[in-house]
UniProtKB/Swiss-Prot annotation:
Cited InterPro entries: Ribosomal_bL27, Ribosomal_bL27_CS
Record GO biological process: translation
Protein name: Large ribosomal subunit protein bL27
Keyword tags: Ribonucleoprotein, Ribosomal protein
SUPFAM superfamilies: Ribosomal L27 protein-like
Family statement: Belongs to the bacterial ribosomal protein bL27 family.
Natural source organism: Rhodopseudomonas palustris (strain TIE-1)
Gene: rpmA
């Protein structure tokens, strides 16, 4: 009798692709307007000076300058872009 037992179905074997989140421009890096600084879910980093936030919480530069991450006493980390003119004055 040439019978073959039915194979069981596996309940594993699924995974979602990585979403490529995280910091794209680190502290001290030069950015131009529109450059993405960080992609995130929720506000892991908050927008500071010259930084905008998209509908998906993406942080982006509004002006040309240097990226700066700063932790405040309230426990939040703010990301700012210091304009080039401001850096020359320092």
């Amino acid at each position: 009798m040439a019978h073959k037992k039915a194979g069981g179905s596996s309940r594993n074997g699924r995974d979602s692709a990585g979403k490529r989140l995280g910091v794209k421009a680190f502290g001290g890096e030069h950015v131009i307007p529109g450059n993405i600084i960080a992609r995130q879910r929720g506000t892991q980093w908050h927008p500071g000076l010259n930084v905008g936030m998209g509908t998906d919480h993406t942080l982006f530069a509004k002006v040309e300058g240097r990226v700066e991450f700063r932790a405040k006493a309230n426990g939040r980390t703010y990301v700012s872009v210091l304009p080039i003119a401001m850096q020359a004055a320092e």
